[in-house]
């Protein structure tokens, strides 16, 4: 969950001193149920493989920019609830969009297939919010972003630079597990 605003679409590290209040994630403050949920929804795909280190990095880079609105517990609950409410993996699978078995055997899809599936299944064709797609090497799907309003309740189109509006993927996306 990355806070943004219209003048600075992706602010980062808003509390730069880790010793300042809110500057460092206090894992002990996160309830065990929340940590277990985050293990499922927000694993680490980085080299460390340690989700706690990943969550700390995400908090420092993005969460600190919402600290005046969401404390650490609320920030991670909101991130989990938004992930859980979207049900993106199931939604895509229901539409026949599934990852390939590995990086050497990815499946390739047209980006519009993802967009139409999300609009049809999540928004029931009633909302015209367009997700952002971020890829490695222009085609390897890394993340799908959906922007949410200041209060964390309503989906909205993302604001920002042209890259942040459309993402970094081309029209063809490769996806693998």
Question: What is each model feature region?
Answer:
Residues 1-37:
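An N-terminal structural lobe/cap that precedes and organizes the functional/catalytic core
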């Amino acid at each position: 969950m990355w806070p943004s605003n219209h003048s600075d679409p992706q602010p980062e590290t808003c509390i730069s001193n880790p010793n300042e209040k809110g500057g460092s994630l206090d894992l002990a403050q996160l309830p065990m149920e929340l940590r277990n949920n985050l293990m499922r929804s927000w694993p680490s795909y980085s080299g460390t493989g340690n989700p706690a280190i990943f969550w700390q990095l995400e908090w420092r880079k993005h969460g600190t920019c919402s600290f005046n609105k969401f404390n650490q517990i609320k920030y991670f609950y909101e991130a989990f609830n938004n992930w859980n409410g979207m049900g993106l993996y199931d939604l895509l699978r229901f539409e026949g969009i599934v990852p390939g078995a590995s990086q050497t055997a990815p499946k390739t899809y047209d980006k519009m297939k993802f967009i139409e599936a999300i609009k049809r299944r999540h928004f029931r064709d009633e909302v015209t919010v367009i997700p952002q797609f971020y890829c490695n090497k222009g085609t390897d799907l890394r993340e799908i972003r959906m922007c949410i309003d200041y209060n964390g309740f309503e989906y909205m189109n993302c604001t920002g630079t042209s890259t942040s509006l459309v993402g970094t993927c081309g029209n063809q996306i490769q996806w693998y597990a």
